Amino acid sequence: MTTGVAVMSSATAASTATATAAATARIPLFLSRNNSSATVCSTLRCRTITRTRTRARLAICCEVALKSDSSTGFDSSSSSPPEEDEELKKNLEKVGCKVKVKSPLKVYHVPKLPEVELTPDMVGVIKQYVGFWKGKYISPNYPFKVEYRIDVPDRGSVKLVVHLKEEEFEIIAE
C-alpha cells in the first residue's frame, strides 16, 4: 500500500478532507475539528492536518495491529508438551525458597560499590523464575532471580538482585 503526502493550504486541506470522506463511501470516515486542527480517520489511514501561521502541515499516523496472523506466532489452542509443564511447575515451586550459593561469586553491578562477593554463608530468596515469559518458554542463561540483603559499612543494608543458574545455588530449609 503506497501512501502519498500533499502540501496544501489549510482551507484547501479541510475541503479536501470532506471531499475524501464523501468520495469513499465504502470506508467509514470521521471528521472532527478541535482547536484549529482537523482530523480525518478511516480504517485504512489516519491523517492529521495542523494549521500554523505560515502553512498547513499534513502528518500521517500509523495504525497498530491488534491481532497477530494466525499462521505465525504462539498458538494458544495447542498445549505444550507435558515434560515442559512439569519442569515449569517444578521451577515455579522454588520461588520464595531461601538459597545459598555453592561457591563464592563476585557481583560487579552494585550501586556505589566496586564489587561484592557472595559467599556460601549468605542467604538469599528466590524472587522470580524467568524461563517462562508472556506465555512463551524462553531459554535464559541465568533463569532464577535471587535477592540478597547485605550489610555494608557506612551504608547500612543494601539489597541486590542476582541472576543465577540452578547449578550455582542450593535450597536450604524453607
UniProtKB/Swiss-Prot annotation:
GO BP annotations listed: photosynthesis
Disulfide linkage: none
Cellular compartment(s): Plastid, Chloroplast
UniProt keyword list: Chloroplast, Oxidoreductase, Phosphoprotein, Plastid, Transit peptide
Phosphoserine: modified positions: S70, S71
InterPro entries the UniProt entry points to: Elect_transpt_acc-like_dom_sf, Fd_thioredoxin_Rdtase_alpha, FTRV
GO MF annotation: an example: oxidoreductase activity
Any one GO CC term of the record: chloroplast
A Pfam family it matches: FeThRed_A
Organelle transit peptide: 1-62
Keyword Oxidoreductase: yes
Ranges for region Disordered: 69-89
Superkingdom of the source species: Eukaryota
Compositionally biased residues, Low complexity: 69-81
Record text on subunit structure and interactions: Heterodimer of subunit A (variable subunit) and subunit B (catalytic subunit). Heterodimeric FTR forms a complex with ferredoxin and thioredoxin.
Annotated family: Belongs to the ferredoxin thioredoxin reductase alpha subunit family.
Role noted for this protein: Variable subunit of the ferredoxin-thioredoxin reductase (FTR), which catalyzes the two-electron reduction of thioredoxins by the electrons provided by reduced ferredoxin.
UniProt name for this protein: Ferredoxin-thioredoxin reductase, variable chain, chloroplastic
Organism: Spinacia oleracea (Spinach)
Gene label: FTRV
